[in-house]
Amino acid sequence: RYGIHLASVFRSGDFVPHVRMPATGKESTSLASLFGLPYVLTSKQRNFDKKTLTYNWQINGTDAFSVYSGETDNIDVNLARKAVSAVLRFLTRMGILKYNCHNGYIASIIEEEDLVSVKASAPGFLRRFVTINEEVNRGQLLGEVINPYNGEILSEIRSTADGIIFY
């Protein structure tokens, strides 16, 4: 049994399309890789996870996956198509239906606690210099926080690690 949850609405902002699974001890990252999305993200259990659909599916013997398309604040037709293709790709690979599509990505498996949060030191308008899924180096300028009243730069935001912009 498989449970596929299209969950993008629960995370605000833009992010790399990925499959997310709570680490219950019953998760299967190898099955999650069959969606062909660039990343499979596992996360340690938090108190509220016990009330989520995917957690309860997994605990009760269903292979459960949350598919995050990459956009929540707007309708992005291209990202929606990629999410639909990922689900159809998975169902085809599991022998449930036949659908012709490209192979997708070889997924990188990452754990949520390996993601590094970068925060601004001041409030204001954000001027981004990098985009989602862009590779960055430690110390690289990611953006600036601008004073909304006079346009002055209040703060610079720099990468604290080498990697990609995930969220």
Task: Show where each model-derived region lies.
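Structured catalytic-domain cores with a bias toward divalent-metal coordination
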Residues: 1-167
